[in-house]
Structures are given as C-alpha cells and as structure tokens.
C-alpha cells in the first residue's frame, strides 16, 4: 500500500509538470545590453516575430553573430540600418543584411558607427542568439556561409 501511494504521488507529480510545460506561451525578445551587444531569446518564437536592438561599431572592430544557443532549425534575418531610430542620421535602408541559422556563428566587417538592428525570425525558433562587436584581428572570415553583404 505504501509503495502504491509513492507510485501515485510520482504519477501525479509527472502530470503536473507535463501540464505546466504545455501551458507556456511563445516568447520572442530582443534586448540591447550595456556591454554593446544584442541578445535574442525565444521559446517557440513564431515566424515573422521582430525586434530592434542597437549596436555601436568602433574603428578596427568587426560584428559577430552567434546563434550556437539556438535550435538548428531556427533562422534569423538581421538588417543593420545606419544611425539610431528617431535620430536625424537614421537611414531606413539597410546598410548590411545577413541571416544566421541555429547552431551557426559568423564574423563580418562593417563601417564604424551606430546601427539600429532589426531582428526577424524566419522560422519558428527556440533558444538564444547574440550579436556583438570584437576587435578585428586582420583575418575576418565567416564561420559558415552567412557572411553579411553590404546593400549599397
């Protein structure tokens, strides 16, 4: 009898955990961090979800996109517009466009300046991604085939 109560308790606990996991709503968030990086966090983020972030590229810096924390099936489209949204020097036309897939990372060069970055989910995604800058070491290459191309 004691063993049966234990089994029933464990089954009840398993059902509660399963039901609570099923109730989570999809999440897609983009945030600009104090360390001059952009974080993308998603849990079953629906296709076409969108967010904005800001990034400053200095002299002799390159942009790093890292989606190694995102599920392999996920894909993000990134558009880098020169200037800060709402400022006089903001351009609605992207200076650079690229995409990054889950599990991949890439490095590319960009002109120094401030950028408004539009992040768009090209598929349903789960996981994390990060966009940041780092000092250029003279050898800039894409980790995969997702090197950005200027749109001008």
PLM ranges: what are they?
Residues 1-11:
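Bacterial N-terminal signal peptides that target proteins for export
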Residues 17-21:
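C-terminal motif of bacterial Sec signal peptides marking the signal peptidase cleavage site
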Residues 23-56, 142-150:
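Transition segment at domain starts
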Residues 41-79:
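Post-signal-peptide N-terminal segment of Sec-exported extracytoplasmic proteins
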Residues 53-56, 96-111:
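Beta-sandwich interaction modules
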Residues 61-65, 107-125, 129:
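Noncatalytic modules at the cell exterior or secretory-pathway interfaces
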Residues 73-92, 132-134:
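Short, surface-exposed beta-strand/strand-loop-strand elements in extracellular ectodomains
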Residues 74-76, 123-143:
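Edge beta-strands of jelly-roll/beta-sandwich modules across compartments, strongly enriched
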